[in-house]
UniProtKB/Swiss-Prot annotation:
Membrane topology term: Peripheral membrane protein
Protein name: NAD(P)H-quinone oxidoreductase subunit H
Oligomer status and interactors: NDH-1 can be composed of about 15 different subunits; different subcomplexes with different compositions have been identified which probably have different functions.
ATP-binding in keyword set: no
Recorded catalytic activity of this chain's protein: a plastoquinone + NADH + (n+1) H(+)(in) = a plastoquinol + NAD(+) + n H(+)(out); a plastoquinone + NADPH + (n+1) H(+)(in) = a plastoquinol + NADP(+) + n H(+)(out)
Keyword NAD: yes
Protein keywords: Membrane, NAD, NADP, Plastoquinone, Quinone, Thylakoid, Translocase, Transport
Lineage of the organism: Bacteria, Bacillati, Cyanobacteriota, Cyanophyceae, Synechococcales
Originating organism: Prochlorococcus marinus (strain MIT 9301)
NCBIfam families: PRK06075.1, PRK07415.1
C-alpha cells in the first residue's frame, strides 16, 4: 500500500514580550519544525530608557540613584562601577574601610542576585517549593541593606566617589555575621532539595551546552563563562577594591550546560559567604569617604597628598567635581558577569561619553545558537539559565 507523502511547513511562534517566563519584556520569535526549534530571534529594546544619555547630562552624584533601576537585582554593582570610573580617571584614593564596606555590599548583592535567579529558574522547570524558601533569605539581605543605606531593593544611593555615603551603623557587622551563620546551612538545604534531585537533573542536564571555545568567542562572562570550564573572575584578574585581602576560590564547572551553570552559582554563594565573614573580621577603622589625603604635622605645615604618613580627611563630593580629560574603561564582576563603563571626560562636571557594558546583553546573544535543535519545552529552561534582566539589556 502506497504511503502518502506529508509535507510540513515551519511555524513561527512569538514568546513574550508579556509572559512571566520571559523575565522581563523580552520577545522571542521562534521558528519551529514540529516541537524542534530551528531558529530563534530575540527582539529587545522594549525597556530602553536612554541611561547612557542621562549619564552624559548629570553629574556623578546625581546619576548614582538612577543606575539601580537598570538591573534591580544588581543595584550595588552598577553603583560601584559608576563611581569607579571617575575615581580611576581622577586617581582618587579610597580609604581602606570604605573599600571593605563596598566589598560587603557587593557580596551581599551577589548572593541576592543568585537567589533571585534561582527561585524563578526552579519555578520555570517545575519546582515551586524552593521559590518561597529562597525569598525568605533574600529578605534578610534587604534588612541589612535597609539598616546601612535606608533602602531595600533599589535606590540605595550608597556608593560615592572616594568611598561610601556613610559608615555602617552600630551592630551591623554582628547582624551580618548572624546572617552568614543562618544562610550557610540554608545552602546545604537547597542542595539536598535540588542538586541531586533526579527529576531536576534529568530536566536540565545536557540542555543548552556551551563549549569552552564558544563561550570565549561569544564574549560570555560570569557563571555563563565559568560553567564552560574557563576559570575567569575579575575579582581575581583585576584585583579591584580589596579582594586580594581575602582567601577564596573561583567557582567553575566543565560541562557547560544548564546544570553546570546552576552548580557555579550555588558555589559562588558559598564563596561570597566566606568573603563576607573575612571582611567582617578584618575591616579596619578610619573614614569611609575621601577626596583629599593630607599629612598633618605640627612641625611641617605642608600637605603631602600621597605621602607615607598621612591621614584621610573626609570631604563630601562637591557638585562641581570635574571629570578630568581622558578616557578609561573600568570593569567589575557582578552576579551576571562583567559589567563595565567606558568614560570620556573633558574637564567638565558631566562626562562627554558614558558607555555601559551590561553582562546579560552579551550573554543573551548566544541564545539563538544554543536553542537550535532544542525542544520547545526546553526554551524556558535554557533562557532561565542565562539570567537576564531586561532593564540592563535594553538600558
Amino acid at each position: 500500500m502506497a504511503q502518502l507523502e506529508t509535507r510540513t511547513e515551519p511555524m513561527v511562534v512569538n514568546f513574550g514580550p508579556h509572559h512571566p517566563s520571559m523575565h522581563g519584556v523580552l520577545r522571542l520569535v521562534v521558528t519551529l519544525d514540529g516541537e524542534n526549534v530551528i531558529d530563534c530571534e530575540p527582539v529587545i529594546g522594549y525597556l530602553h530608557r536612554g541611561m547612557e544619555k542621562i549619564a552624559e547630562n548629570r553629574t556623578n552624584v546625581m546619576y548614582v540613584p538612577y543606575v539601580s533601576r537598570m538591573d534591580y537585582a544588581a543595584g550595588m554593582f552598577y553603583e560601584a562601577i559608576v563611581v569607579n570610573a571617575p575615581e580611576r580617571l581622577a586617581n582618587i584614593p579610597v580609604p581602606k574601610r570604605a573599600s571593605y564596606i563596598r566589598v560587603l555590599m557587593l557580596e551581599l548583592n551577589r548572593i541576592a542576585n543568585h537567589l533571585l535567579w534561582l527561585g524563578p529558574f526552579l519555578a520555570d522547570v517545575g519546582a515551586q517549593t524552593p521559590f518561597f524558601y529562597i525569598f525568605r533569605e533574600r529578605e534578610m539581605i534587604y534588612d541589612l541593606w535597609e539598616a546601612a543605606t535606608g533602602q531595600r531593593l533599589i535606590n540605595n544611593n550608597f556608593f560615592r566617589i572616594g568611598g561610601v555615603a556613610c559608615d555602617l551603623p552600630y551592630g551591623w557587622l554582628e547582624k551580618c555575621i548572624d546572617f552568614c551563620d543562618w544562610f550557610g546551612p540554608k545552602i546545604d538545604e537547597y542542595e539536598k532539595l535540588i542538586t541531586n534531585n533526579p527529576i531536576f537533573r534529568k530536566r536540565i542536564e545536557g540542555l543548552g551546552t556551551i563549549q569552552r571555545d564558544q563561550a570565549i568567542n561569544w564574549s560570555l562572562s560570569g557563571p555563563m563563562l565559568r560553567a564552560s570550564g574557563v576559570s575567569w573572575d575579575l575579582r581575581k584578574v583585576d584585583s579591584y577594591e580589596c579582594y586580594d585581602d581575602f582567601d577564596w576560590q573561583i567557582a567553575s564547572e566543565k560541562e557547560g550546560d544548564c546544570y553546570a551553570r546552576y552548580r557555579v552559582r550555588v558555589e559562588e554563594m558559598r564563596q561570597s559567604l566566606s568573603i563576607i565573614r573575612q571582611a567582617c573580621k578584618m575591616i579596619p577603622g578610619g573614614p569611609t569617604e575621601n577626596l583629599e589625603a593630607q599629612r598633618m604635622s605640627t612641625e611641617d605645615k605642608k600637605s603631602e597628598i600621597f605621602g607615607i604618613d598621612y591621614q584621610y580627611v573626609a570631604k563630601k563630593v562637591a557638585p562641581t567635581f570635574k571629570i578630568p580629560n581622558g578616557e578609561l574603561y573600568t570593569r567589575l564582576e557582578s552576579g551576571k558577569g562583567e559589567i563595565g563603563v567606558f568614560i570620556q571626560g573633558n574637564n567638565e562636571v558631566t562626562p562627554w561619553r558614558f558607555k555601559i557594558r551590561a553582562a546579560d546583553l552579551n550573554n543573551l546573544q548566544i541564545l539563538p545558537h544554543i536553542l537550535k535543535g532544542a525542544k520547545i519545552a526546553d526554551i524556558m529552561a535554557i533562557l532561565g539559565s542565562i539570567d537576564v534582566i531586561m532593564g540592563s539589556v535594553d538600558r
